[in-house]
Amino acid sequence: MDGLTLKRTPDAIKWIQDSLAESNIDYVLKHGTYTTQIQHSMGTIKLMLNNFQNRVFCASQMVKKDCKNSVNGQEIMKATHYKKNYDANPKIESIKYDTCLNIDLSSAYAYCLFNSGLITKKTFNYLLKLPKMERLTSVGMLATSHVKYFYSGGKCVDFQPYREPTAQIFFYLIDEINYLMQDIKWMLGNDFIFYWVDGVFMKPTTPKSKIEKVENLLISLGYKYKYEKVENFSVNRIQDKVIIDMIKNDESKRYEFSTGASGRELGKHIAKKAMQDLQN
């Protein structure tokens, strides 16, 4: 079974484990976000969730190298960052609109990396050339994790978890984009409906002056954006749970999330604003 590369499924992993146990062969099972490797005395078997192009791994290595070599990257890796990336207007209980305004950031994480001085222009341009999902995957590999399970006599005798040292940089990206979305939320006031990751949704009656403020903010921070077509938009709230349905770019979408206590998020936003004022 040396040198095999298979599609990662529970059945495939079980078959290999059973075969090794029956043959009384000790092995190490390394299970990660995208791949599972089974290393034994006769070689290694690799099981892949997706068959990524080499350019994805190349981009990932370029990003990691740049981040590790940057002064800002070293500081970010020492800190802890929040991972929340959504929010909704607490005053909205239930609404329906034939159409809705939606601004999406273009290549948000790539621009955040570059704007934060974490990657070089060369790496930034390489990322922008990748298709969207490949770009997201290559940046997401900053937070790659795996667990090694050590098997002897067909039973697990030990395990070792591992997380990439650059993981906090990925969480920093989430945090920074979330902070930007919070800024936009405050700008829009009652016209804000909700945001999800790097896309913000607002009422179709939002004044042009508010929209221009949002656009000017994004431009000033070095982000590109686009407007997406949104129809049949509805929001329903059940206590802390928000359910949002829409047709976006002719595709049906649903978002569900909880809007529980967000005091920590609000406090962080206020503190960051205050620090910016003090520094200026």
In which residue ranges do the predicted regions lie?
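Conserved acidic
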Residues: 1-280
